[in-house]
Amino acid sequence: MLDTFLERPHQMTKAPERWSPSQAVRLAIDWRVGHCVALALGGVLTGQGAIAQDRFLPQASAVVLAASVHTAGGRSSTLRALDQAWRAQPQDLSAALAYARAVFTLGFNEGDLRWFGSAKAALTPWWQATDLPADGHFMRGLVKQGFHDFDGGLQDINRAIALDPARAEFWSWRFALHLLLANMDAAQQDSEDIARLFGPQEGQIYSAVLAYRTGQALAAVQKLSESIRLPDYQDAASQVWIGFHLGEAHRVAQQPEQAIALWQRLLQVHPQSHLLRLSLADLLNQQGRFQQAKAVATASSTQLNSNLTDALLMQALLASRGLKAPDEAALAQQMAARLQSQALRQESLIERPKLIYQIAYGKDLAAGLALSIENWQQQKEPPDAVLFAQAALARQQARAAEPVVQWAQTTGYTDPQLAPLITQLKAHPSWSKERP
């Protein structure tokens, strides 16, 4: 769940190609995207077949469609050409890397990370290779972290940096993974190295992200407010990337109205940004502005919401509950069907929408707490900390969330949602009981 520095690839005047955040990190550090819909492949993904992209509730005997994920209409001719080139020469590393990068990026941009399975399929012949070029290690590292092998992903990205230290995107993702793993000292070093290698303007952005993740949100707001106005960062990807983090800094600094206004403005200019749409819908729900949250989450949705990501569907469901809207039951049924479909496909990783459904929506608090405990062992992100604390309190097991309290104390992180929950955990009668 890297919910994320996924960026669309682009070139900048002073910094090499970078990927926009979009849900990291779930992915690298997109803290709000309900990321990493990784699949238990079980031999299903091969060079000739991949998980079907369209949502479906399969029969137990047919949980996977063998057709290319790109046979569905609407895909660009460029993507189709990359797909065909890879399938024509599945042992050609260059073709495989080009295809893997394209579908990995698509998964993030669409908020549907089942495309990660397609990326892994392309890289399967080199999954154990030790002599890859820098791009090979980098792409394999991204896919590994997408499947929650964060240590393996970090090893590959470290190797990519060793082979080609002049690639800014390599450093960006390593910074993101260090944040995900709560290794703040390493993230600080990455930030300093980025400033040294790619200039102080670039370094300032990373130091600002680190600032709001370590209790210095107002300083982050000031830095990011400067960065978003710089001439070198006026391209679409940079505006979304910096704007997302500036909004997060506002939110963490107890300035939700500023965050909402910023994300609304950016979303009007970049309506295809899943990251901005999800972040805005989530914050509007947090603020009790359910009508607006639902409108943002369901913009351009089909009648049955089949084109909504799980994360956006979950926000629509929370908004409908807040509104006491008559479609709440139907939305809940759609969410349950998707989770059932994932179970039939044997998807083994924990998505944030599932945690929200179980905990914030209250469908299964016991299961939600168990999943939170498991998830926290892998990755440590603010939205997951909130859900973990909520589940522990609801189940009268405050001490179960002690790792969240320790993480907050160590990193200095706090936000308007988490702070009162930590106070409640420490004051709860079960907190003073013997540790489990």
Predicted regions: what they are:
Residues 106, 110-113, 147, 181, ...:
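Structural motif corresponding to the intra-repeat A-B loop/turn of tetratricopeptide repeats
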Residues 50-135, 427-431:
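N-terminal leader/linker segments that initiate helical-solenoid repeat arrays
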Residues 90, 131, 165, 198-199, ...:
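Short coil turns that delineate tetratricopeptide repeat
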Residues 98, 139, 173, 206-207, ...:
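Canonical tetratricopeptide repeat
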Residues 95, 136, 170, 203-204, ...:
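TPR alpha-solenoid repeat register
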